[in-house]
Design a protein with these regions (language model features):
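Acidic, metal-coordinating helix/loop segments flanking the phosphotransfer/catalytic sites
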Residues: 30, 43-61
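Hydrophobic/aromatic residues positioned on beta-strands within the core alpha/beta folds
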Residues: 90-93
Length: 138
C-alpha cells in the first residue's frame, strides 16, 4: 500500500527525514531545511533506522546519503521507504556515480557533496513542487 502526502504537507510545512551517517552534515542539512520552513521529524544514520523512522514519522520528503558506512545503503533504505510512501527523494552524496548504475529509485534528485546551501534549498523546493502528489493536491 502506498501512502500519499497530506494537503498540509504539500501546501505548507513538510515533514522531512534525513538519512545521513555523518552527524555534522546531518545537522547542516537540518538547519537548511528548517530555514525553508520545513520540519525535520527524524534523522537516521543506518538503513534500518531510516526505514523504521519513515514508518513512524511519515515524512513528506527524504534527503538521503547513499553510503551509510557500516549502516548499509541509503539506496536500499529509500527503495524500502518508497514501497510504502509516495514521496520525493533527494540523494546528497559524495558518490554520485553510484546512482548512474540504473538501480536508483525513480524519480530522484541528486546533489553532489560538497554541496552549496543554495543548491540544497533550491532542490528541496523543486522536489516538493514537481512531485506528482504535490501537483494533484494543488
Amino acid at each position: 500500500m502506498t501512502t500519499t502526502l497530506s494537503p498540509d504537507q504539500v501546501a505548507g510545512t513538510t515533514r522531512v527525514l534525513i538519512i545521513e551517517d555523518e552527524p555534522i552534515i546531518a545537522l547542516d542539512l537540518e538547519n537548511l531545511v528548517s530555514e525553508l520552513g520545513h520540519k525535520v521529524v527524524a534523522t537516521a544514520s543506518t538503513r534500518d533506522e531510516a526505514v523504521a523512522k519513515a514508518k513512524s514519522e511519515r515524512p513528506g520528503l527524504v534527503l538521503a546519503d547513499i553510503n551509510l558506512g557500516e549502516g548499509g545503503s541509503g539506496i536500499d533504505a529509500v527503495n524500502e521507504i518508497l514501497a510504502s510512501f509516495d514521496i520525493p527523494v533527494i540523494f546528497i552524496t559524495a558518490y554520485p556515480e553510484k546512482l548512474l548504475t540504473g538501480e536508483r529509485p525513480e524519480p530522484t534528485y541528486l546533489i553532489a557533496k560538497p554541496f552549496l546551501p543554495e543548491t540544497v534549498q533550491a532542490t528541496v523546493g523543486q522536489a516538493l513542487f514537481f512531485h506528482p502528489v504535490a501537483k494533484q493536491a494543488a
